[in-house]
Amino acid sequence: MLGMIRWVVEGTLVAMLLSAIRRETGMIFFYNQYQLGGWIHRYLSWGEMCYTRTLKMVKRSKFFRKQLNEDGFGRINDSGPKRRGRDQSQYSSRFVELD
C-alpha cells in the first residue's frame, strides 16, 4: 500500500513540474502523438490543479514572503535564463502553437 502511495505522490510531483514548465516557458509535453493522449491530458490537468492549489496555499501562508534582491537568488524581475531563437512573448500562458 505504501508503495502505491509513493507512486501517486511522485507522479503528482512530476505533473506539477510539467505544469510549472508550461507556465514559465509556454512549452508543453507533446502528448498528441501517443495513443494514450486522453489519459496523458487528464494526468497533466491533475498536475495543473495541484500546482494551482499549492500556489494558493503558499500565497496565504505566513511561512513564505516575496523574494528580495538581498536573498541572492538573482534578480526578481528576471524572466529566467536568456532564451535563444524565437521570441516567446507571442505565446499565451494557456495555449501554445507547435511547429
UniProtKB/Swiss-Prot annotation:
Primary subcellular site in the record, as a coarse category: cytoplasm
Q: Where in the cell is it found?
A: Cytoplasm
Record region (Disordered): 71-99
> Origin, by domain of life?
Eukaryota
Supply the InterPro entries for this chain: Mitofissin (IPR013726)
Disulfide bonds, paired cysteine numbers: none
**Sorted alphabetically, which keywords does the UniProt record give?**
Cytoplasm, Signal
Recorded hits in PANTHER family, A to Z, give: CHROMOSOME 16, WHOLE GENOME SHOTGUN SEQUENCE (PTHR28075), DUF1748-DOMAIN-CONTAINING PROTEIN (PTHR28075:SF1)
Q: What is this protein called?
A: Uncharacterized protein YKL018C-A
